[in-house]
Amino acid sequence: MGTVHARSLDPLPMQGPELGVQADDMDLGEPEREEKQEVLENKDVVVQHVHIDGLGRTKEDILTYEIADVFHAKNLIDVMKKSHEARQKLLRLGIFRHVEVVIDTAEGADALPNGLDVTFEVRELRRMTGSYNTMVGNNEGSMVLGIKLPNVLGRAEKLTFQFSYGTKETSYGLSFFKPQPGHFERNFSLNLYKVTGQFPWSSLRETDRGVSAEISFPIWRTSHTLKWEGVWRELGCLARTASFAVREESGHSLKSSLAHAMVIDTRNSTILPRKGALLKINQELAGYTGGDVSFLKEDFEIQLNKTLFWDSVLSTSLWGGMLLPLGEKASSIADRFYLGGPTSVRGFSMYSIGPQSEGDYLGGEAYWAGGVHLYTPLPFRPGRGGFGDLFRTHFFLNAGNLCNLNYGEGPRAHLSKLAECIRWSYGAGIVLRLGNIARLELNYCIPMGVQSGDRICDGVQFGAGIRFL
């Protein structure tokens, strides 16, 4: 809860030889202690003043929303509870290094007998901070350097410059973030970026230069994000041996799209949950706000987690998506879905399922993938209560398919095609949770349902990332 200081509303009895009162002369029986406890916990109080000490460049109006509930407290316990909640809100703004709370009796000419003053002692972050860290993506590691200007305009705004150098991707960007006063979950962000990625499974190199604007807000138990993005995309071949199908995709394109994402997440952890569920739905519409790329793209993700006996966890997941080109132009290799690898359908090489040409995987316009997982403690529980709890034994069954659809046919024909040539795999391994950052998997995989052109990874397969099927 941090540091909370409180002083009793009534003066405590004093003792000592200089006062002529000895401890033996005082009645310290149980009934009086119970009465004192009742006074502290249940006596009605009024919060008269709330002070914030230590402000420099922060505007006070942005903080008024975060501490307003403290004035509604009715007793001392309620004051402490609401003060702690206000402290958490202040820290969530990301503009203070630390926040301490002091609760004291009210002072001044207008002080009431049951009045309280609450003081938040804050220390602001420096005007500029730097950071260096490593990140783990979908089977990719990267080094990240960042410069941040927190509270740049005094109302919890944040200006960030970030450079990332990874094994397959290099990027840098500038972003501006501003929350709505009193509602941190409602915020606006503006981003400028350049990303260069290499995709060896497709012999493709892509460079994106873009700008995006996002608005995030909650509705009931759901989180929503509305986004506009304009991207200048440059596609090129990664090697001279690239297939003709990939060479045809080379060149420049301009994508302007509107996107919406909805998330319901009740999981206790995003990396290795033990309970809870996740529902994520994404829609993207390109072409109606400009550019030469037009499509409608839909995809979803569902995950359910249930704790079983002997500290084991059963997890099920389902992914799916569809891409519909609008107009006469075919879909781009940069917009299609990809499937396979240690983070999706295990036992297959990275994104090496589905349509391909001369060994280059071209992606598909429709896909689905599902998995059933059983996570158990390590045999004999070595390191229980400590480092050993970061490891779990992992048993899995994965399945999925990726293909292109003929949109002149009906839904029944589409479902029939998605049900054909299903790839699936099963196996077992060990999972290591790296805090709330990422997780590592080392599995022994047995791929089944392999189709012509698929690239498999029969045996031991290593995976690292955040999002796993």
Curated annotation (Swiss-Prot):
PANTHER family: SORTING AND ASSEMBLY MACHINERY COMPONENT 50 HOMOLOG, SORTING AND ASSEMBLY MACHINERY SAMM50 PROTEIN FAMILY MEMBER. InterPro entries: Bac_surfAg_D15 (IPR000184), D15-like (IPR039910), POTRA (IPR034746). Associates with the mitochondrial contact site and cristae organizing system (MICOS) complex (also known as MINOS or MitOS complex). Belongs to the SAM50/omp85 family. This is Sorting and assembly machinery component 50 homolog A. Its C-terminal part seems to contain many membrane-spanning sided beta-sheets, that have the potential to adopt a transmembrane beta-barrel type structure. The gene is samm50a. Its main location: mitochondrion. Residues 45-125 form the POTRA domain. May play a role in the maintenance of the structure of mitochondrial cristae. It is found in: Mitochondrion outer membrane.
